Amino acid sequence: MRQKDIYFMPLGGAQSVGRSCYYLRLGQSNILLDCGLQRINGATCSPDFHSLLTSQFMESMQQLDHVYISHAHTDHVGYLPQLMQMAPQASVYMTLQTKQLAEYRLIANSSQTGAAEASRLLSNVAPVNYLQKIKQRDYTVTFFPAGHIPGAMMTLFEYAGRKILYTGDYSLQSAFGLDGCWLPDDLEVDVLLMCALHAKQPYSVREKNTLPQRISEVMSNLRYGQSVYLQAFDPGRVLELLMALNREMEQSGQVYPIYLEPEAMAAVHVMESLQLPVLQQNNYSSFYAGAAHPHVVIGTKRKEQVSWRYRIFGNAYTLHEDYGEMLSFIRRLNPRQAYLVHCAEGYYGHTVEQELMRDAQCRTQVVFPEEGDIYTI
């Protein structure tokens, strides 16, 4: 290995969605970007640490120096407690909001013993602020807001005269009091490590199937006197829907009752116990038959279990950028190289790579890295 070379190795979530975890070597520093898990048919899939430990970089997890967590979705943070047990010496960085949300998610998905251990481990996390700069042994790192969900951050590394930006999941658009991502206008990036969900899906359009679109449809139904039932089978979805609805109602001045079924309220109570306020005056812990219409119910009932009085909205929506927004983001930064990870399966055989190759103003070489492969940047 040459001293000034930069090495990149996906350990999960390369050309798939789930268990995002990426190894980055800067000088003598061993770094992990995110540490997620994926559940498939009841089985838990973790990052491929075996490939890392049989590589030229590390022989033991005790050699890991730093971990940077972009945001609190399970596919980016879910395996962190296990990693912290394997590598207790590694410094872990995330924003305070991400730490709070991560603690909730990890507690909600663990046994009582596992929840206590997750809480203990997360107490050792070093919270960071946006625009904060930290000088490490071999490099400097700065954090920027990523949008997407509260607390999400982009991470900029400066090493050997080069700048490497890891986006994590991000959003260019502002919605419900949460601003989109922000980077300095004059920022020059050499290498972009980009979570690019729709990089292989040219007909992905943000206006379809997004959280803002979902909230807009809910509010439209309420204005016409139609009560709404929101299915939220994941605790994180409960919080996203409730917080987004509360923000929209506050901003519009049109406030309707929101009832939370027991499973949904349990998720909220955990967040409140972590000093992250969620509930508003129009939020109620249970629904009663005589409740005036229109109103919203957030719960876990299947379609056939819900009264015909309700317009039902399912659990599927996206918080990600669309294909066109991704292209504009890459063109704006115009990096020398862009490594696109966290990519959903394509279905038209067309990717952002072909689009950018036809752009004479764009210098970016696009790479779709594979898990377990080592890339010299």
What are these regions (language model features)?
Residues 1-62, 129-179, 295-296, 301-303, ...:
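Core dinuclear metal-dependent hydrolase active-site scaffold
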Residues 11, 16, 247, 285-377:
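C-terminal regulatory/interaction regions
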Residues 14-19, 26-69, 73-74, 78-90, ...:
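Pre-active-site segment of Zn-dependent metallo-hydrolases
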Residues 29, 87-91, 224-226, 253-256, ...:
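A short helix->loop->beta-strand "cap" motif at the edges of active sites that frequently abuts
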Residues 32-35, 64-75, 80, 93-95, ...:
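Active-site neighborhood of phospho(di)ester-bond hydrolases with catalytic His/Asp-centered motifs
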Residues 103-152, 274-294:
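Metallo-beta-lactamase
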Residues 153-244:
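Functional cores that coordinate and move charged inorganic groups
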Residues 212-307, 341:
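Hard-cation-handling environments
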